[in-house]
């Protein structure tokens, strides 16, 4: 595993013109942040040794390098999901490669179903913590020596970055929520009973990604900021049939606000 990570990192280092310390994983319907990137060059996942390939509509499947404002960044346009059939090692492989490339801060975004009764479709939620409801743990197996065997997760989402994001949202007049994200396997959306259970467990929003990558980032010593766009509601009395197209539409409508916060925050890190 370590050899494969290092082989992939060595290939990318040979292609890279910059040395970013900031990475972004762009989720469902939120990939248009790449339109803000200047001086960019792209590498398709299919050209990268050992890299999985995304199969989901709305996930393009390429690494993008360039500048966001004055900051050198790398962005994953298209992430890998456990429900696609990948192992947890494959889902989180890119984060380990990021560590080899010198990434220090990771920004993640996703689409999520809101279970907090105060949430509305289109809200942005800053992730303050998460619940791991996946059936497999990304650190199961032999410990890769990027971090300890038993990593601390008491601050999985960096409090300093959360505070800065709050300041930016206030300056820009953008409404943001705060909440706990629960990560599940998918690919089904939740039943009303599951929404109710997750809410009882303390979650504010639910989705099918993010948690594995955040766990591995923390293991690697990479600090994390995460944000969800609430694309559907799992609140009793407000639950309706949901399609992937509905999720993408809601995410696309909220995208300009998320882009503003992410761009400003990345440039203040």
State the predicted function of each range:
Residues 1-153:
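Metabolite-binding pocket within alpha/beta catalytic cores that recognizes anionic/polar moieties
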Residues 11, 15, 160, 164-174, ...:
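Generic non-transmembrane alpha-helical segments
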Residues 99-102, 199, 218:
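Non-catalytic positions within long, well-ordered alpha-helices that form the structural scaffold/packing
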Residues 104-105, 204, 223:
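Short acidic/polar active-site loop segments enriched in Thr and Asp
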Residues 162, 168-204, 262:
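Active-site/ligand-binding-proximal alpha/beta "capping" segment
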Residues 208-246:
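Zn-dependent metallopeptidase/amidohydrolase metal-coordination segment
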Residues 235-269:
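His/Asp/Glu-rich mid-to-C-terminal helical/loop segments that flank catalytic regions of hydrolases
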């Amino acid at each position: 595993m370590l050899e494969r990570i290092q082989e992939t990192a060595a290939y990318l280092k040979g292609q890279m013109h910059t040395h970013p310390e900031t990475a972004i994983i762009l989720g469902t319907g939120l990939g248009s942040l790449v339109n803000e990137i200047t001086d960019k060059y792209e590498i398709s996942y299919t050209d990268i040794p050992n890299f999985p390939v995304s199969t989901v509509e709305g996930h393009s499947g390429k690494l993008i390098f360039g500048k966001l404002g004055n900051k050198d960044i790398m962005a994953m346009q298209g992430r890998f999901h456990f429900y696609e059939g990948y192992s947890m090692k494959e889902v989180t492989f890119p984060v380990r490669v990021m560590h080899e490339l010198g990434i220090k801060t990771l920004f993640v975004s996703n689409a999520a179903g809101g279970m907090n009764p105060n949430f509305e479709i289109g809200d942005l939620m800053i992730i303050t913590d998460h619940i791991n409801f996946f059936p497999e743990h990304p650190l199961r197996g032999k410990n890769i020596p990027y971090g300890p065997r038993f990593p601390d997760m008491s601050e999985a989402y960096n409090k300093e970055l959360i505070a800065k994001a709050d300041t930016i949202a206030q300056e820009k007049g953008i409404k943001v929520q705060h909440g706990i994200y629960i990560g599940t396997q998918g690919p089904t959306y939740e039943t009303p009973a599951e929404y109710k259970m997750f809410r009882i467990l303390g979650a504010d929003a639910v989705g099918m990604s993010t948690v594995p990558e955040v766990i591995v980032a923390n293991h690697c010593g990479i600090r994390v900021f995460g944000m969800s766009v609430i694309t559907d509601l799992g609140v009793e009395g407000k639950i309706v049939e949901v399609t992937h197209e509905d999720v993408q539409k809601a995410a696309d409508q909220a995208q300009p606000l998320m882009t503003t916060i992410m761009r400003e925050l990345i440039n203040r890190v």
